[in-house]
Amino acid sequence: MRVLLSNDDGFHANGIKALKEIVIKSGIASEIWVVAPLNNCSGSGRSVGLNVKVQVSKVSDTEFIVDSTPSTSVFLALRKIMNYKPDLILSGINHGVNIGNDVWYSGTVAAAAEGAAINIPSIAISQEYDNKSGEINWVNPQRFLKQIIEMLVNVSFWNKSTVMNVNFPLMPAKGIKFTDQGKYVPCNEIEKNESSDDSNVSYTITRITPNKKNRAQCDGSIKAIDEGYITITPLKFDMTDFDVLTSLNSLK
């Protein structure tokens, strides 16, 4: 199996290194490619570098650094960089979960979505970390990811235009739950940077996902992660609200 790895934390991030090590040890891949952004692109969503020159640097015959977004990285990998399309795309392991509204912002999910757009099985993988210390470990992915990948690639009813979004909890995992995405109200952690010019002010958005205390009433993947479960959520990218569409059509 030819596997393409990408992410949104950047080519040199620890998460994608951990992912590659897991894939190698699992023996599921006969060929591993890594095509990932030069820099951290967290929160970039599905932005693509249109009408700009994108520098691609070759690290080895199967490793490339793209000076652009996660979506651009995979877009180019599938059309210009790789000699053959991959059998599977794995995006991650992201430093932080992608649950609830996160999927709208996530470059990790976006990288996987580029594969799903042309019906390549694609999995986004994210790991919760300690908000206070910033520490992260890969124990849960190391223990469970091989099993999850093997299970998913053998699902006969998986519509390959659907991204499988996998999130690992910080605590030792209690098991796996298949969940809906869920939703939350974004938090307001924004820092105003010091400036002597009131007409030219800068801000830093430090956090979007609410902490556990402020998401206690949330459901779906948010609740399951907070309970200590690995979550798997199938995501499709036709975002039409068909109930509202039906109602709108009744206005004719």
Swiss-Prot record:
NCBIfam families, A to Z: surE
EC number per UniProt: 3.1.3.5
Gene3D superfamilies: Survival protein SurE-like phosphatase/nucleotidase
Keywords linked to the UniProt accession: Cytoplasm, Hydrolase, Metal-binding, Nucleotide-binding
Family, as annotated: Belongs to the SurE nucleotidase family.
Name of encoding gene: surE
Family matches, as PANTHER family: 5'-NUCLEOTIDASE SURE, 5'_3'-NUCLEOTIDASE SURE
Protein name: 5'-nucleotidase SurE
Catalytic activity: a ribonucleoside 5'-phosphate + H2O = a ribonucleoside + phosphate
Gene Ontology cellular component terms for the protein in this record: cytoplasm
Binding positions for a divalent metal cation per the UniProt entry: 8-9, 42, 94
InterPro entries with a match to the protein in the record: SurE (IPR030048), SurE-like_Pase/nucleotidase (IPR002828), SurE-like_sf (IPR036523)
Described function: Nucleotidase that shows phosphatase activity on nucleoside 5'-monophosphates.
Required co-factors: a divalent metal cation
